[in-house]
Amino acid sequence: MILQAALFLAGLTVVSGSICCPPKQFNSYQYVTFVNSTTTIRALYYIVYDGDNQRYLITGDRNNKQLVGTTKVIYDYKKRIAYSIDAKARTCSKFPVQGQFEDQENVCVPGGAEILGPLFYGYNQSRLNSQSYAYNTTSLDGSHHNVVTTVSEDDCVPIVICTITTGGPGGNSLYTVGYNDFYPGIKDITVFDIPPYCNA
């Protein structure tokens, strides 16, 4: 299930240049919902995003003591390869990544995005000022995506991203990602270590 939802946006391409981007390295929870005519997927993932090294990690089987569980997928765009790792079973599969790193996970608001206006979460002095944008993309398979993203106004931290896809496999679809507990920087860089059994 991690792979299904995480691969959905892996082939998107956007206009070069950006209006804004979040910090180059961050950790966050992602609540993902994907719906099309045949499938509904809801999942809570944890993402570790390393823009400095063009890689990110997604895991879905955490517990309260561990942010990264025993299964994870590491997308390494410098090496042009991804690893699906199950540390408990000591298994690993590799597959090529598609597209460019800058286009993955839709974390940057691309140049040319239409401003939909300010939004406010909370109230009074504790409110979070945010900005909402809309833009269109086309993936490598030719499907079209209308993306609406809401980010914090001061530092472009993603809050929610909603993507409507037309012409894709399985028909039209809706993909939403809500971000929670966003933390700039990387708490533990060793989460990107590739175990020896991946290279066997």
UniProtKB/Swiss-Prot annotation:
Gene Ontology molecular functions: calcium ion binding
Signal peptide: 1-17
Listed GO CC annotations: extracellular region; lysosome
Cell location: Secreted
Keyword Cell division: no
GO BP: cell-matrix adhesion
Superkingdom of origin: Eukaryota
Glycosylation sites: 36, 124, 136
Expressed in which tissues: Component of the acid-soluble and acid-insoluble organic matrix of prismatic shell layers (at protein level). Expressed discontinuously in the anterior zone of the outer fold of the mantle where its expression correlates with shell pigmentation.
InterPro entries xrefs: Ependymin
Similarity remark: Belongs to the ependymin family.
PANTHER family associated with the record: MAMMALIAN EPENDYMIN-RELATED PROTEIN 1, RICIN B LECTIN DOMAIN-CONTAINING PROTEIN
The protein, known as: Ependymin-related protein 1
Organism whose genome encodes this protein: Haliotis asinina (Donkey's ear abalone)
Organism classification: Eukaryota, Metazoa, Spiralia, Lophotrochozoa, Mollusca
Encoding gene (name): Sometsuke
